[in-house]
UniProtKB/Swiss-Prot annotation:
It is found in: Cytoplasm. In the N-terminal section; belongs to the inositol monophosphatase superfamily. In the C-terminal section; belongs to the NAD kinase family. NAD kinase and pNPPase show maximum activities at 50 and 20 mM magnesium, respectively. Its EC number is 2.7.1.23, 3.1.3.-. Pfam families: Inositol_P (PF00459), NAD_kinase (PF01513), NAD_kinase_C (PF20143). GO terms for biological process: lysine metabolic process; NAD metabolic process; NADP biosynthetic process. The active site is at D362 (proton acceptor). Residues 302-574 are annotated as: NAD kinase. It comes from Methanocaldococcus jannaschii (strain ATCC 43067 / DSM 2661 / JAL-1 / JCM 10045 / NBRC 100440) (Methanococcus jannaschii). CDD domains: Arch_FBPase_1 (cd01515). One of its GO terms (molecular function) is NAD+ kinase activity. This is Bifunctional NADP phosphatase/NAD kinase. It catalyses: NAD(+) + ATP = ADP + NADP(+) + H(+); NADP(+) + H2O = phosphate + NAD(+); UTP + NAD(+) = UDP + NADP(+) + H(+); 5-methyl-UTP + NAD(+) = 5-methyl-UDP + NADP(+) + H(+).
Amino acid sequence: MVIMEGFKIAMKVIDEIDKKIKPLIGWEKADEVVKIGADGTPTKRIDVIAENMAINILEKFSGGILISEEIGLKVVGDELEYIFILDPIDGTYNALKSIPIYSTSIAVAKIKGEDKKLIRENINNIDWIKSFIANKYTINDLYVGIVKNLATGDLYYAIKGEGSFLEKDGEKIKIETKNIKDLKEASVGLFVYGLSNDLLEFLKERKVRRVRLFGSMALEMCYVVSGALDAYINVNENSRLCDIAGAYVICREGNAIVTNKNGKPLNMKLHLMERTSLIVSNKYLHKKLIALFGNRWIIKPVKFGIVVREDKEEAINLAIEICKYLKDKNIPFCVEDFLRERVGGDKFDISAISHIIAIGGDGTILRASRLVNGETIPIIAVNMGKVGFLAEFCKDEVFEIIDKVIYGEYEIEKRSKLSCKIIKDNRVIKTPSALNEMVVITKNPAKILEFDVYVNDTLVENVRADGIIVSTPTGSTAYSLSAGGPIVEPNVDCFIISPICPFKLSSRPLVISASNRIKLKLKLEKPALLVIDGSVEYEINKDDELIFEKSDSYAYFVKGQSFYNKLSRCLGIK
């Protein structure tokens, strides 16, 4: 009875806004910004009018707590029965421009009996009520959700335990997500403000059949349940509680999976300023979308692989402490053979590992990257060396980040790698990928080499030098930096070509897009070496060609301090 009463009151709000807002579409004053809303965004006149209508209905027919973008939190009516989460107009721009994709949405939770007295005792202390509601109630306490397209009249609604429904053209239809399994067949709605590299790549590579941008988050979530879309994605942490509350209930009751971009279920507090990223889809597409946009490792079982610098006792001692720490927490781990006699653990098996802890300097971290060998295994890079440009953590931070990994409270940074093919006597030799750089250098000291440098088959320069470096952005702080190359932020999609001690002063480092193909051709009858990340070597001779491209594989790091903090530390600035 209480549930149906809450639903009926919410429907009265929807109907009143629907009836009174339609005449305002096209009214020139509807577009005026009249204030800054409680959520910190500009509020249009049409939003205020819609919100005031909702307040009038709630005060007349009910009572409780209203949370809305414009007013913030308000106690309405005499009775403390319900919590209402309202978005008066979702898609305000569409409404003002007569684009028929805008909605009003509302969600309802029941105030628990024991909480009513406490709220009433503090009825004049709005800050206390905000804090109390936020600490006691979450989005999962909502049991009614309603979203109405005010332009078409399509009405989506759900009541907890009863499923989700669409009323359209006088017909009531039970709706739930479709069972499409292949991303290539999927239609996906996107929120694209603040495009990430992952999202740009997703669009560029056409990983789905079609992409749509409608501009009304609540409706787009409902479209996933009705089958008009197969997924909705917002990778930014800006989906607001009021934007999604009503649609969240409809999605939940319509068998949609709704999580943040990392696959963690939503548990948003009922507070105006709550924000989240969002992936909504059926169960078949969901893990695939998490793998594209989020931290897929959060939803994997954790087993650590320990890689440590063998000749540094301090690094070995830290590895022993880490292994003991993991044992005490009953977290499985595996170690290399030289360490197993001292700490136990399983034999090192890359196929069984979810994360690698690399303890040492940049050389150890590069070795860990080679052990990963193209697998999508994140590295926790712990600095025990002298500089540590690749390391994200110092030894004092390692136990804290291990706990964060165990509990899924961390982020991943994806780093591009460099691939190379050697064309020698009409044979093609494919080398391992490089995380830092590939260097072509004279095999005999003090002997100059000569190269033709091509970008996409266009001859860019003839270089005479001791060698030449092709570096990733990650490697820009390594050998390339010593050769006069620029420092490049790791998420820039580029490569750096840096001559080593060039004969001509005009031979300068060159930064090019990672979408290009680089070709080096050795011109002199002098033996040379291709050295990959300072360890793997190939002999190069006259007329051999080296083709460098962006690798299909990436390196993944558990994210620590910002790049610029790390840069200033490594350069001795602070």
